[in-house]
C-alpha cells in the first residue's frame, strides 16, 4: 500500500512497507542512490532497503554518522560533503535520509548544498520525524549549541512514512513525538486531541497511522501557506522559542521534546499574562495532555530529569537573544494561543514581541514554584 497523504508543499506518502519497488519508480537507475543514516539504523533498518534498490538496478552508497543531537555540527556536515566528493557523486544522484530529526536535518542540508542542490528523499523513522522534521523543507545544523543556526529551506522530492518502523522504538521515544502532535492540536487542529486521549490505543497500527496522517496534513497545510516562514508558518514555533533556549542551556541533557513541552506551558502562561488566551482552561488542558504521556510541564521537571543545578532567569533571557527569529528587539517574538486549535494571528504576523518585564515575571514565578514546592 502506498497512500499519497498530500502533494503540497511536497509529496508525502504513507506506506505499509518500504520494500515496495513502486516507491523507486520515479527514480532513474542511471544515477546512484546515496543513503545517509546513523550507525544504529545502518544495521537495523537499512539492509533490506539497500537489497531492494540493488535488485532494481541502482548503484547504492551508504554514509553513516553517529547518533544524537551532538552530531548535528559543521564537522559532520563537511565530512559528508567530503565523502560525496571522494565518491564523485553527480548532482543527479538522489540523497535519501533514513532516520530521525537529526539525520533528516543534516541530510537535507547536504542535499540542498552539494553541487548547489541534489534530489532528496526523507524516510523518517521516529514519530517526531514523521509528523514534523520530514515536512516543509527546513534543514540545518547547530553552531555552538545554538539550534539550527545554519541551514536552508529545501523541499524534498518525497517523504516515505512507514508507521511500522516505529515498532523498533521504546515507548518513551514514541511519547517524545507526541509533544509535536499536541503542538499541532493547540495551534491549528483541535481534532487531533481525541486521538491522544488513550495512550494504549496508539499501540494499534491503524490508530497510530491515523494520528500520523492527521498531523502530516496539519503541518503540510500550514507550510503550504507560507513555505519561507514569514507569516503563518511561524505558528509551528509554538513552544520552540523558549524550548530552544532551554535546549541550548541544557547542552544535550534533555530530549528536544521535553524542552518543547515545557516551552509550550511557559508560552501559554505568557498568552494568559497578556490576555491573549481566552481562558485559563487552555493551560490546564495542555498540562493534562502532556502529563498523559509523561512529558514535563515545568522547569522543575526538567531539572529533575537532567540532574543538574538550576540556571537562573538571566541565563534563559540571554539564551533567547540567539534565537534566529529575533529582529531588532531585545527578545524574539512569541507564538501565542487564543484557544485550543487557534494560534493568535496578530494581524497576519502570527507572533508577537513582548516586553522583557512580562517574560521575566513568568520565569520568576516558575523559579519560585520550583524552589518552594
Curated annotation (Swiss-Prot):
Binding of NAD(+) occurs at 67-72, 101-105, 125-126, 138, 147
What the entry lists under InterPro entries is as follows: Dehydroquinate_synthase (IPR050071), DHQ_synth_AroB (IPR016037), DHQ_synth_fam (IPR030963), DHQS/DOIS_N (IPR030960), DHQS_C (IPR056179)
- Keywords, ordered alphabetically: Amino-acid biosynthesis, Aromatic amino acid biosynthesis, Cobalt, Cytoplasm, Lyase, Metal-binding, NAD, Nucleotide-binding, Zinc
Which Gene Ontology CC terms are recorded?
A: cytoplasm
The reply on keyword Lyase is yes
Where is the protein found, in the record's own terms? Cytoplasm
The cofactor remark states:
Binds 1 divalent metal cation per subunit. Can use either Co(2+) or Zn(2+).
Q: Does the entry feature the keyword Isomerase, yes or no?
A: no
What pathway does this protein act in? Answer: Metabolic intermediate biosynthesis; chorismate biosynthesis; chorismate from D-erythrose 4-phosphate and phosphoenolpyruvate: step 2/7
Q: What is its EC number?
A: 4.2.3.4
Q: Which domain of life is it from?
A: Bacteria
Question: Where does this protein hold Zn(2+)?
Answer: 180, 240, 256
A GO MF term: metal ion binding
Q: Which GO terms describe its biological process?
A: amino acid biosynthetic process; aromatic amino acid family biosynthetic process; chorismate biosynthetic process
Catalyses:
7-phospho-2-dehydro-3-deoxy-D-arabino-heptonate = 3-dehydroquinate + phosphate
Cofactor annotation: NAD(+); Co(2+); Zn(2+)
Q: Name one Pfam family in it.
A: DHQS_C
**What does the UniProt function comment say about this protein?**
Catalyzes the conversion of 3-deoxy-D-arabino-heptulosonate 7-phosphate (DAHP) to dehydroquinate (DHQ).
Family of this protein: Belongs to the sugar phosphate cyclases superfamily. Dehydroquinate synthase family.
Recorded hits in PANTHER family, A to Z, give:
3-DEHYDROQUINATE SYNTHASE (PTHR43622), 3-DEHYDROQUINATE SYNTHASE, CHLOROPLASTIC (PTHR43622:SF7)
The entry's protein name is: 3-dehydroquinate synthase
State the organism of origin.
Chlamydia trachomatis serovar L2 (strain ATCC VR-902B / DSM 19102 / 434/Bu)
* Name of the coding gene: aroB
